[in-house]
Amino acid sequence: MSDFLQICTAVAPPLFLLLVGGLCRRGGWLRVEADASLSILTVRVLYPCFFFFYLVGHKGTLIPFHFSVLICSGFISICLGFGVALGVGYLMKLDKRVCSSFSFCSGIFNYGFFAFPVAGAIFGEQLIPKIIIFNLGVEIAVWTVGVYLLASNQFKLKRLINPPIVSIILAVLVREIGGQSIVPDFVWNIISLLGACAIPIGLLLIGGNFGDLI
């Protein structure tokens, strides 16, 4: 029973933030016009700071073998999701273009905004760096296999050079040459503050989108 309560306690804050986002949208406080700019800000600034903060600040060791396993696991899990969704789309006899969009949307699970706070609350924040590395594999799959599914003629490897992926690679390099000790305190504080905003704002935006559907 205590485990069940622990899980409920861990899930409650993200769900509450979703609810707040939905209520703000319904009340006109979180307007649709703000979604695009806030989404870009979250993905290109807040999320990378979140990754950098937890990877560089992580006190444990990141063994290269485990690093590779986590990346491969993230990549394979999304590819399996795409495959299953494609199979379902074919069984439903969806149009080819619709099937591709369906498989892309259905094959991607919530690997970030909901996963981080729940996993951190249940297993401790020491798990978050591992989820970030896992997400590197997910991002690679989304920007390669996923983009190819949606539009094979627009598939470009340069799409892999985006802020979240770059921040992970940069964080790993900083860890190797000294870690947090080589980052000036004021810079570290800025990264910490920006990173702390990533999950709440992301969940508020998702909640706002849910509010549009109700």
Q: Across the structure, where does each feature detected by a protein language model lie?
A:
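Alpha-helical transmembrane segments of multi-pass small-molecule/ion transporters
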Residues: 1-214
